[in-house]
Amino acid sequence: RIQKGMRVDRTGKGIQVPTGAVTIGRILDALGDPLDGQGPVGDENTPRKDILQLPARSTELNIQKPEILETGIKVIDFFTPFVKGRKIGIIGGAGVGKTVLTMELINNIAQSGAGLSFFTGIGERIREGHELYDTLKEADLLKNTCMFFGQMNENPIQRALVGISSVALAEYFRDEQKKNILFFADNMFRYIQARNELATILGQIPNEGGYEPTIFSDVKILQDRLSSNENGSITSLQTIYVPADDITDPAVQMIQHELDATIVLSRAVAEQGIRPAVDLNKTSSSLLTPEIVGDRHYVLSVQVQSLLQKYESLKSIIAIIGENELSPADRSDYAKAKKLIQNFTQDMHVMEKHNGIPGKSYTRDETLASIEEILA
């Protein structure tokens, strides 16, 4: 127990986490200590890494053909394709399905054997950590997963550092073991929240948005470490909590600017019974190009986005004059848009034990074919 008046000796070392195969299948905290009750992680001979030590910058130009990782979730594979080595964010308020969607992605992608998986729980519920652990254990995926937790009951130091610690270990496996990494973080907003708490304790003056004065550079440094080089790739999926459902919040915008694609979950969509509750008009991706997804997928995406925008404008007109007053062409487009929205609804595998409904997965070709059928 630490208390006032105790003697403190400085070791001259930073916070170091264990590395290597001994960490796979284990649950660690921000300091690299085990949380799973399965004994110590390694021994005194286990190599350790300073979590703040940045890897040497690559001098090689890493140009590789984009590789799409299929998730089996239609709305993601179509609107925000999961591209190896890139960053995708799931943005939404409380209770709209961010964690469920993340767990489904872990379940679907990790089973494909696409690489070593990392899951980092930052400031989230302990219950969700237990559920994820049980899900991975049942699917026999722990043997290919590293887990870090700094849950909401922990002090702000643990919550602020746990993301950095997990990134440091991911860098080790990428650079030393030449592994491709799938990095899942839930929730990046809690990282900012934890740093805010630390800034308040230290008496720092907040910036104009009410956040820690150095938060922009702190987030930038962390995001820059989630990158690929000639040794391997880090593909990251991050959830971002939206306080009071305000997507214009400075912290949300700050993280969003670091991402290649954003999946926006909406309470209004969830209230319609659509799962996953994705707002199709606000969801966007810079990776949705002909060079990455191909001409067929790209042309369909342009047609679908145009139809969905028209659907939103027609909804306002229908509220005033009724659907029967629309022209035949508008009625046809309105009906197609409603079919498309329903087409992107699907049951999740990770929810099967809760609701008894079997989950479904679809290949990208199946998704494109179903959309072509609706648009025909």
Residue ranges and their predicted role:
Residues 6-8, 15, 22, 35-86, ...:
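P-loop NTPase nucleotide-binding/switch module
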Residues 21-32:
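Short, compositionally biased
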Residues 1, 172, 190, 200-376:
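Conserved catalytic/coupling modules of large nucleotide/cofactor-utilizing molecular machines
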Residues 18, 22-23, 166, 356-363:
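Glycine/charge-rich, flexible interdomain linkers and switch-proximal surface loops
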Residues 12-17, 33-34, 94-95:
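Short, charged beta-turn/beta-strand-edge "cap" motif at the junction between a beta-strand
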